[in-house]
UniProtKB/Swiss-Prot annotation:
The gene is truA. Its EC number is 5.4.99.12. GO terms for molecular function: RNA binding; tRNA pseudouridine(38-40) synthase activity. The active site is at residue 51. This is tRNA pseudouridine synthase A. It catalyses: uridine(38/39/40) in tRNA = pseudouridine(38/39/40) in tRNA. It comes from Delftia acidovorans (strain DSM 14801 / SPH-1). Belongs to the tRNA pseudouridine synthase TruA family. It holds the Pfam family PseudoU_synth_1.
Length: 282
């Protein structure tokens, strides 16, 4: 039978999703736990690979097994053997025609960014950070240049293995949430005389696209932040896109605040569409 799993993880301690000789990847730990629970070797295929330091709220994998076990048994049994920062959220038997990657019609990511004169501490590794205030309107205007089908070569890592740089970005939303009074007081007390006042807040960038190139979201983030800080005008994003050269774009931004929200499937597969942890993001 074929089984699909929804997996959530904090990627800080791991070398990304895909199995490596080091054994310190999410896939390595998941397959080891599944193997111990099933008492046999288990090989998984995922909806979308994530890089070192990137988190996953609902990575979807599938595997084939001769064992017929209840969904709750796969969840609880596998989690028994997983480290505390990786957990199976749900399990569901699926038809043999289901493929976690090939059946996905889109993929979704979120980037959570802290704007504050004080670097994150408790949230270290879970949010990106900028010291300077960002212009939301400028970033919104820049983001509109990226919507639709484009050649995203300018936002592609040199080691990207995708067959084509042409992808479709369906949605890029940018929202802001103010931090609490304590954060505002801390921000004010850390400013030097003469510094411009800055509100402490969280920016949330959500991406939905047909598929994503290696480092594509982080490279777009680098450009959006450069525009938000006033280094470039919003129209610069179109110039970067048209250049089709990685050299034209801003540096790759930190992986810390990047979350793979999960794939999008046709409702007929009957799989959960969103992780409960989605509502916990700032």
């Amino acid at each position: 039978m074929r089984v699909a799993l929804g997996v959530a993880y904090n990627g800080q301690r791991y070398s990304g999703w895909q199995s490596q000789l080091s054994g310190n990847t999410i896939q390595d730990h998941l397959e080891a736990a599944l193997g111990r629970f099933a008492a046999q070797e288990v090989h998984t295929l995922c909806a979308g690979r994530t890089d070192a330091g990137v988190h996953g709220l609902m990575q979807v994998v599938h595997f084939d097994t001769p064992l017929d076990r209840a969904p709750f048994s796969w969840v609880r049994g596998t989690n028994t053997f997983l480290p505390p920062d990786i957990a199976v959220q749900w399990a569901q038997p699926v038809p043999d025609a289901f493929h976690s990657r090939a059946c996905a019609t889109a993929r979704r990511y979120a980037y959570v960014l802290l704007q504050s004169p004080v670097r994150p501490s408790v949230e270290a590794g879970r949010v990106g950070w900028v010291f300077h205030a960002l212009d939301g309107d400028a970033m919104q205007a820049a983001a509109r240049h990226l919507l639709g089908e484009h050649d995203f070569s300018s936002f592609r890592a040199s080691g990207c293995q995708a067959k084509s740089p042409v992808k479709t970005l369906h949605r890029l939303s940018i929202t802001r949430r103010m931090a609490g009074d304590g954060a505002q007081m801390a921000a004010a007390s850390s400013m030097r005389p003469g510094d411009a006042a800055m509100e402490c807040c969280y920016w949330r960038f959500e991406f939905e696209g047909s598929a994503f190139l290696h480092h594509m979201v982080r490279n777009i983030m680098g450009c959006l932040i450069a525009i938000g800080q006033g280094t470039y005008a919003p129209q610069w994003m179109q110039q970067v896109l048209d250049a089709r050269s990685r050299d034209a774009a801003a540096p790759t931004f930190s992986p810390d605040g990047l979350y793979f929200l999960g794939p999008v499937y046709d409702p007929s597969w009957g799989l959960p569409s969103r992780s409960p942890a989605y509502d916990w993001l700032p």
